[in-house]
């Protein structure tokens, strides 16, 4: 219990000591992975560019972060998005699918990123293959010390300038703990940052978190929205967006 409390306090200390960055997180300390290793991973694209990550929940539902539905404070519409599935490369191969409807949490707060979660309904159902698969929602939070995987196309370095990969990245991170708002995971050298927002945090082939915010220079833990904490909202939102 002491170790669990210490890890959580460490995460909170990291994120309170520095400003938490809002959008677009990146993979730090990761490596190239193939889409078959994370077949639920998708790239949200706006104006032909990768903007955020997301996860396939079903043949027509994507889970992502609420702040991914905004561009410079402007609320985007479903028609503004294309979703690339089934490719390790954000800019080629796989399939591009249009979005029919979007819904973010009604209590989403853009200042502190609480309730930073959203769902999207695709305009046509996906064909599942070894490169395109759904991922189930976790029913409980993982214990501190659990190893999880985070993936995405976010920046891989920040100095001397931001460097973004074309190829999907993945990294194993340590679960630090949860509080009433967020799940924390990662550390200096192994974390998320600019471009990975909305992407998956996975334990035992289950979606446990959605990338939300990070330490200002992406050199500390990442805060995720807990999927188990938002499970009821997700299931209700998915049902409503299918109507």
Report residues per predicted region.
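Conserved H-D interstitial segment of serine endopeptidase catalytic domains
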Residues: 20-26, 44, 62-107, 166-172, ...
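Extracellular/periplasmic catalytic domains that process cell-envelope and extracellular macromolecules
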Residues: 33-37, 56, 75-77, 91, ...
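Conserved, non-catalytic sequence blocks in retroelement Pol enzymes and Pol-derived host proteins
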Residues: 29-35, 108-112, 161-163, 191-195, ...
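Chymotrypsin/trypsin-fold serine protease catalytic domain
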Residues: 87-88, 100, 117, 122-123, ...
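Conserved, well-structured core segments
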Residues: 40-43, 52-63, 117-121, 149-152, ...
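Catalytic histidine site
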Residues: 34-76, 216
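Extracellular/luminal ectodomains of metazoan preproproteins built from arrays
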Residues: 4-36, 129-130, 141-148, 235-243
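C-terminal subregion of chymotrypsin/trypsin-like serine protease catalytic domains
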Residues: 2-14, 57-70, 81, 172, ...
């Amino acid at each position: 219990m002491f170790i669990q409390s210490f890890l959580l306090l460490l995460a909170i200390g990291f994120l309170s000591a520095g400003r938490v960055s809002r959008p677009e997180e990146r993979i730090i300390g990761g490596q190239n992975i193939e889409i078959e290793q994370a077949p639920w991973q998708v790239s949200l694209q706006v104006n032909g560019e990768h903007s955020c990550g997301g996860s396939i929940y079903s043949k027509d539902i994507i889970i992502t972060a609420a702040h991914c539905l905004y561009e410079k404070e402007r609320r985007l519409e479903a028609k503004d998005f294309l979703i690339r599935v089934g490719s390790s490369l954000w800019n080629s191969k796989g399939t591009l699918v249009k979005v029919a409807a979007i819904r973010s949490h009604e209590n989403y707060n853009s200042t502190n990123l609480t309730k930073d979660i959203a769902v999207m309904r695709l305009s046509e159902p996906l064909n599942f293959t070894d490169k395109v698969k759904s991922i189930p929602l976790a029913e409980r939070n993982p214990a501190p010390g659990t190893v999880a995987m985070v993936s995405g196309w976010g920046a891989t370095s920040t100095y001397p300038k931001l460097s973004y990969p074309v190829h999907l990245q993945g990294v194993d991170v340590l679960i630090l703990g949860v509080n009433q708002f967020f799940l924390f995971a990662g550390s200096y050298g192994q974390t998320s940052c600019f471009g990975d927002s909305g992407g998956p945090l996975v334990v035992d082939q289950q979606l446990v978190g959605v990338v939300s915010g990070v330490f200002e220079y992406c050199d500390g833990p990442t805060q995720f929205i807990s999927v188990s904490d938002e499970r009821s909202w997700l299931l209700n939102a998915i049902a409503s967006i299918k109507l």
